[in-house]
């Protein structure tokens, strides 16, 4: 991306995107029949949904989406790098008439979510993150009556065959909840990344945060967070990983004394030659 970390973190640049499709496998025969987008404006989240009532409306849906893509530099999705965006690129290619306006940057929040919360939660599905990380009571809605994603394609096929449009209301609601959850998740992740010390007390979350900063090349910050994670307490396996990462960072920064001390601890505790 041509944008700096600071520019990526500006909510005014974000366009949230989520699609509902005729299949979950992707491929040239899969359509995005509902494309939802959202953005922050005037202190609130604006949500817009483009619905394809029949296949001949695909061009209009993609044109409307393209106009929105032109207005924001940073596309924000959840698993969008693997699913939503490749699918939309395929649909743009199939219609031929429209060239997609590729965003300057694409933030797929699935990846930082895995780093931050998979060790604690196991599943990092958006609905799980809403419940256990974001807090449904703070969000102002719950997924209690939400529809299962696997049922959505059939509801659309039934509608195309002349069925009642009423079941689609739940699909629209599901898409809107995904967008609102995505916006809340972006705020949470960037809040963690931007805070000097972080409103974080959970050792596993601190460990995930330290790994993100480590990958971004921010060694000093990563080192401090690894130390905080160890102080907060980690499961044995993760504790060993944190010490190993700290030892590697110390060695790269020329602090051979600390690196040797950490490797010594690891060797004593794990009785593993891998520490060396």
Each model region followed by its residue ranges:
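Conserved DEDDh/DEDDy metal-dependent 3′-5′ exonuclease domain
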Residues: 45-136
